[in-house]
Amino acid sequence: MEFPETNNNPIITLSFLLCMLSLAYASETCDFPAIFNFGDSNSDTGGKAAAFYPLNPPYGETFFHRSTGRYSDGRLIIDFIAESFNLPYLSPYLSSLGSNFKHGADFATAGSTIKLPTTIIPAHGGFSPFYLDVQYSQFRQFIPRSQFIRETGGIFAELVPEEYYFEKALYTFDIGQNDLTEGFLNLTVEEVNATVPDLVNSFSANVKKIYDLGARTFWIHNTGPIGCLSFILTYFPWAEKDSAGCAKAYNEVAQHFNHKLKEIVAQLRKDLPLATFVHVDIYSVKYSLFSEPEKHGFEFPLITCCGYGGKYNFSVTAPCGDTVTADDGTKIVVGSCACPSVRVNWDGAHYTEAANEYFFDQISTGAFSDPPVPLNMACHKTESLRTLASV
């Protein structure tokens, strides 16, 4: 009786076993014990409000029922990310009252940039002094200070991360929009485009420094369609519009930034092979609500929900939550629209909770990620798994 031939090549057998083990490992979801976030108002859970001045109602009205310092009527994408891992909402690093840093910290502040801005708060139209270099410095101090508190003991020891959390944590980034905004207010579109390589190189340098402090899993958002925001449409009413009504040239700059950011993230993967980098195309997800709002259950995407006056219900002199005087002398509180749950634009520059939840639902699947890995598997090195699976 003849038996079928078997391939006893040890190299092929070992490759097969490694492939199976790796694929099994990849099916496990990540158990991030903490999240450390860096960015601007898209992910600021109250940092700017703690450092400078609070936001007035109706900010926060939908979910928190009070103003928390978030630039929305409710939760941000970073809040939904925390919820998805059963982690508490991130306390702002700058908040000295009631903060709990056990499961991470938020270093983002509204108005933050990658590079040092030319005009800083409290100057009129100023940007945050807590640009990315400063956020990195804050994180660098946070690590030893938090561990000193843990070692000292007492009631505060349980409010800071354990040492191993820093390597196992998820590191999220959403920054760059304000660098482009500052450029648009002071430079030509062509000149802003020319600043992009320096911006992404500066971003990369900070990511590498954060890596040197122990970070290993990076979740990086590109920037959104800034030309669809009503503050840009109001500032530059003469700009050519696309089919969605967005300012084409300004979105093209955002796309140029995103292209260069994706390139620099690819280079980071090569330079730091022990880390995992997921690049998230938040631009495409956000633009879908401007180009096809009804398809996704939204309406009037270009019109500000909490605003006053003008074609887009937005005026820089009548911001959300402010009190303004009408032409007839009547005092008017700039309040929310009737149904924020079906609106996209909250205050002219930021998004509603409903939009933020939609964005999270889309990006968490991995459909807009490079590599295409779901958020809950972002700790796995999918490039290695692909290589093994193809053996």
From Swiss-Prot:
GO biological process: defense response
Alphabetized Pfam families for the sequence: Lipase_GDSL
Glycosylation, residue list: 186, 193, 313
Entry PTM: The N-terminus is blocked. Glycosylated.
InterPro entries reported for this sequence: GDSL, SGNH_hydro_sf, SGNH_plant_lipase-like
Gene Ontology MF, one: IgE binding
Active site per UniProt: 41 (nucleophile), 347, 350
Highest taxon above the source species: Eukaryota
Enzyme nomenclature, EC number: 3.1.1.-
Keywords: Allergen, Glycoprotein, Hydrolase, Plant defense, Signal
Enzyme class, spelled out: hydrolase
Family from the record: Belongs to the 'GDSL' lipolytic enzyme family.
Its job: Has lipase and esterase activities. May be involved in plant defense.
PANTHER family: ESTERASE-LIKE ISOFORM X1, ZINC FINGER FYVE DOMAIN CONTAINING PROTEIN
Protein name (database record): Esterase
